[in-house]
Amino acid sequence: GAYQISPGLDTYVDGTGWGASSWGSGTFGSSSAIGSNNQLRLWSMDSFGEDLIACPRGGSIYYWDYTNASTRAIALADLAGANLAPTLGLQVLISDVDRHVVILGADPINATASGRTGAIDPLLVAFSDQENAAEWEPLSTNTAGSLRCSAGSQIIGGLRARQETLIWTDVALYSLQFIGAPLTFGLTLINEGISLIGPNAPVNTPTGIFWMDKKGFYAYQGSVQPIPCSVHSYVFDDLNEGQAFQVFGFLNKQFNEVGWFYCSGSS
C-alpha cells in the first residue's frame, strides 16, 4: 500500500546480512546498509510555540503548523524561508532558553556552505537562530550555529533540564547551556565513562534527572551520582542488550518514583 513515511521496525537491528532487508535483495554474502527505514523507529518531538517539530531517529525532520491543522507536516528544509536547515537528525528538541531548535546528530553544512551534506554527523549538535526554526546559517547577525561532542562515536540522546540540556554520547555526558553572544551555547563535558542505554531512558523529575545505563542507574543534580539498587542483578543479568534502545523511562508522580520498561533476556 501507499504511505508517506516508512513505519520502520519495532525491533533494533545490530547488523545486517542474512535476514536483513527484503527477500532476494543484494548478492550472496554481502551486507546491506542500515537506514532509518529498516531500523527501530524512534520518534522525538517537541513543541515550538503552538507548532510541532518531529524527527524519526536517523531520518528527516518535520515541521507541523498548528494554524493549518488540516495539512500534513512538511520537511523542515521545505519551511518557508528555510536557510541551510538540517535534513537529517537523531533527535530534535527545543532549548530551555530563547527557543532555539536543537538537532542532535544533524547533517552538517557542506564545504561550500551551499547546503547540507545529507549524511548524519553522529556527534554534531546544530541549533537554529533564536525563535526562528527556518534560519540555520551561522552569521554574525543571528544566533544559529553548531557544536561537536568530542568524546564518543555517537549521541545516544538528550533531555531538556533546568537551565541546561543534557546530552549523552555512548561514553560521556555533556551539558549544553545558553551563554549568549557570540557563541550562543557552550558544551561542557560533565562525566566520561558513563552513557545512556537508549534515547528514551532519561527521566526529568522535580528532584533531578534519572537514567538507566547498560550497567547501572544514575541521577544528576549538578553532578552525576550512581543510584544503589537492590534489584541490580535481577535487572542487568536478564537484560536484552541487543534491544537496549527500546528501554523507556517514566515518572510515577503518585508514588514519587521513577521506573524503566526494558526487554528481558528471553524477549
Identify the residue ranges that each predicted region occupies:
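Small/polar beta-strand repeat architecture
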Residues: G1-L42, A69-I74, D78-L84
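A fold-level detector for beta-propeller and closely related beta-sheet-rich head/sensor domains
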Residues: A33, C55-G58
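Short glycine/acidic-enriched loop and turn motifs that connect beta-strands
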Residues: G59-S60, D107-A111, G216-Y218, G265-S267
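Surface-exposed loop/turn elements that mediate protein-protein interactions on large endomembrane-trafficking
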Residues: Y63-L76, A113-G145, S175-G186, Y218-H232
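Solenoidal tandem-repeat scaffolds enriched in leucines and small polar residues
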Residues: I94-G115, A119-I120
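Beta-sheet-dominated scaffold domains
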Residues: S150-S267
